[in-house]
Amino acid sequence: MSTVYETLYILRPDLTDEQVELAIAKYQNLLQEQGATDLEVQNRGKRRLAYEIKKQRDGFYVQFNYNAPGKAIAILERAMRLSEEVIRYLTVKQEVTKEKEDKVAVTA
């Protein structure tokens, strides 16, 4: 059973563009290995933080939207928690609107 999730995470500002791309690819591959589908990646770029986090004032914002089983979230968040490149992350379960449910039912 897959659920629609959105994960937003912030990477350290001192990473190079290549390191940012590698980090995005690492978490993208991790999700795909855990059975995530319809993965959309949005690199929102470097932005100023509203307040200081881990002595950082800026960060690279990255957003994932995807369908995945619940166990994939725990694995993804554990990897982010242990990583030194991620300074903050948040995963939320998306509400599926009635229109999308009807569209899924028609295509199935």
Curated annotation (Swiss-Prot):
Q: What CDD domains does this protein's entry cite? A: bS6_chloro_cyano
The lineage is: Bacteria, Bacillati, Cyanobacteriota, Cyanophyceae, Nostocales
Any idea which UniProt keywords this protein has? Answer: Ribonucleoprotein, Ribosomal protein, RNA-binding, rRNA-binding
Q: Which organism is it from?
A: Nostoc sp. (strain PCC 7120 / SAG 25.82 / UTEX 2576)
- Protein name as it appears in the record: Small ribosomal subunit protein bS6
Gene3D superfamilies referenced in this protein's UniProt entry, alphabetically? 3.30.70.60
Q: Which family does it belong to?
A: Belongs to the bacterial ribosomal protein bS6 family.
Q: What does this protein do?
A: Binds together with bS18 to 16S ribosomal RNA.
Q: Which residue spans traverse the membrane?
A: none
Can you list the GO cellular component terms from the UniProt entry?
A: cytoplasm; ribonucleoprotein complex; ribosome
